[in-house]
């Protein structure tokens, strides 16, 4: 069972990328569980065709400790198992704690079955605070992929996340598997992301081009592979899934200093 955490700044398309990749892996016959670790609880919506799944934290609040696995785990596209951690009530408590609570509950309820090929954690990634680092800190997820684009803030966030991965790699055995570019059609984006990944000592695992088909599928509450499997964009996610499935390059990243990151951005025309 490979346990993978997907990080990236808010709004970068992390949940969309994760679900489309999971759909491609499921199409290829893989058994997968997706654990949403974002208070927005939108990490499984496309796999569940828009079903607004009740989160682990909401279920705990409503039902108390007496919970069955089927109360929090729903089956989605390609027999994927879908769980949403959820978050605390706004202004009260720490969302990171919710992730810790959820993963512990899933373990105690026997969600991590031996037939699973993959567990994906879709994690809010602007902040690598203790709770959001839970999937990597506790040694659950061994592989990290960071979703980024050629935009400055996406790369700042990706570099910061790399610092968190580096910190836990030395103690926990977690490794960076690569950078996923979710394109924003920025000038020189492919070259910049390739150079950025190389600078970290990693690789660009795939460049996902921007395509309105992704939004069209989302409006229909589906992944692209589910909505229109013959689309070229569906093949992009299949390629990404294959690259992750066959990946053997796992590194302790070497995050950049602020100055070096800005040099890189300037060299590729992102900063003046």
From Swiss-Prot:
Quaternary structure and partners: Homodimer.
Gene name, Swiss-Prot/TrEMBL: nifH
Organism (species): Desulforamulus reducens (strain ATCC BAA-1160 / DSM 100696 / MI-1)
Pfam families for the chain: Fer4_NifH
Keyword list, A-Z: 4Fe-4S, ADP-ribosylation, ATP-binding, Iron, Iron-sulfur, Metal-binding, Nitrogen fixation, Nucleotide-binding, Oxidoreductase
Annotated residues for binding of ATP: 8-15
EC number: 1.18.6.1
GO MF annotation: an example: nitrogenase activity
Enzyme category, top tier: oxidoreductase
GO biological process, one term: nitrogen fixation
Cofactors demanded by this protein: [4Fe-4S] cluster
UniProt superkingdom: Bacteria
CDD domains found in the cross-reference section: NifH (cd02040)
List of residues binding [4Fe-4S] cluster: 94, 129
Protein name, per record: Nitrogenase iron protein
Lineage, opening ranks: Bacteria, Bacillati, Bacillota, Clostridia, Eubacteriales
Family to which the UniProt record says this protein belongs: Belongs to the NifH/BchL/ChlL family.
